[in-house]
């Protein structure tokens, strides 16, 4: 059977230990398996800590695999923090994920208050100064902007502003995930901004659940409508 992982670059793999849940892999155990499978590179992600240093420390032990990290701008990492973005860039980080588990949109869907929004307080369309500063830092450091778990309206606003700022690499995270649910018409509108869409295997509906809702059918339909 052909090795399906040979030459693969996976840009979304979670590592632990995480503060709120158990992860299957650390950077070392993950890299060991992936290098043995013949993959080319990994981008390691965590919700509550930056992963650039973890990638940097593990890299010498896996010469046949390229390891990268970044930062998710949740409360635990300082939120919408342009200084953190620049620091992680200096540590070799490649990806900045806008708020994920601590996004206001995410918490609202769980019936919880608070959270981080890219809009000004009380607005549903005006971008906050903190978010603008983060986008400017991403443009300055040439990192990849990932849209995280923001609402669809926030993601659209962020993509437009990122494009205007000259951010070269914009990744729309898992549009099929039930907490985001970006329809194909919205995705089509974003194509003119040169975005990439992340088509994930699936996603859990409950934080404590190990049963994933598979996205194959939705991903295939969106790819057929929009292209790869």
Regions found by a protein language model. Give the residues of each.
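Hydrophobic faces of well-ordered beta-strands that scaffold small-molecule active sites
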Residues: 7-13, 42-44, 68-71, 96-98, ...
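Anion (oxyanion) recognition and catalysis
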Residues: 35, 61, 89, 139, ...
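Divalent metal-binding pocket/active-site signature
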Residues: 15-24, 95-184
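Divalent-metal coordination cores built from histidine and acidic residues
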Residues: 52-117
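Short, acidic/polar
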Residues: 22-31, 78-88, 183
